[in-house]
From Swiss-Prot:
It comes from Edwardsiella ictaluri (strain 93-146). Belongs to the UPF0266 family. Keywords: Cell inner membrane, Cell membrane, Membrane, Transmembrane, Transmembrane helix. It is found in: Cell inner membrane. It comes from the Bacteria. This is UPF0266 membrane protein NT01EI_1718. Pfam families: DUF986.
Length: 156
C-alpha cells in the first residue's frame, strides 16, 4: 500500500465518520431534535470541481494502468463526496436548550437578537458573531420563528 493509498483511505474514513456523525449522532445529542430545517446548499461549484478532479484521477489511473486498489479508493472517495455534497442536506437542528448550526451547538441564551433580511436570510446575532442562515424552503423561516417563540426562555 503506497502513501497515496493511505492518504485516500484516511480521507474516505474521515468523510464517512463525518457523514455518520451528521446523520446519526448529532440528531440524538443533547436531547431529542424538536425541529429540523434543511439549509440551502453552498459551494456547488467547488464540490463539482472536486468531484471532476477525482473523476480525472480515476481516468488517469485506469489509462496509466495504475494499481486497481488506488482506482477503487479514488472511486470510493468520489462516491462519498457525491453523497456529502449533493445527496445530504446541511441542516439546522433545534433542541430543548439550543440548536446545531454548522455542526456547532449554540445555546439559546447566547442569542442577542434575530432579524429576517429581505432576501430570505435569518440573521441571528450572538455575543461575538452573527449567523446568516439561508434555508432551502422559505416556509421553514415561519416554522423557525414559531418554534423560537414557543421555546423562548423566560427570565429568572
Amino acid at each position: 500500500m503506497s502513501l497515496t493509498d493511505i492518504a485516500l483511505l484516511v480521507f474516505i474514513v474521515l468523510f464517512l465518520l463525518y457523514a455518520i456523525y451528521d446523520e446519526a449522532i448529532m440528531p440524538r445529542q443533547r436531547s431529542a431534535t424538536l425541529l429540523r430545517v434543511n439549509l440551502k446548499r453552498r459551494n456547488k461549484a467547488d464540490s463539482l470541481i472536486f468531484i471532476g478532479l477525482l473523476a480525472i484521477l480515476v481516468y488517469r489511473n485506469i489509462s496509466d494502468q495504475g494499481a486497481p486498489f488506488t482506482t477503487w479508493l479514488l472511486a470510493t472517495l468520489m462516491v462519498v463526496a457525491i453523497y456529502i455534497f449533493y445527496l445530504r442536506w446541511p441542516k439546522l437542528l433545534f433542541k430543548q436548550q439550543g440548536f446545531y448550526y454548522g455542526n456547532v451547538f449554540i445555546d439559546y441564551a447566547r442569542i442577542r437578537g434575530m432579524n429576517l433580511s429581505e432576501d430570505g436570510f435569518l440573521v441571528i446575532d450572538l455575543e461575538k458573531r452573527r449567523l446568516l442562515i439561508q434555508v432551502a424552503n422559505l416556509d421553514s423561516l415561519d416554522e423557525i420563528f414559531k418554534f423560537l417563540l414557543e421555546h423562548q426562555q423566560k427570565p429568572a
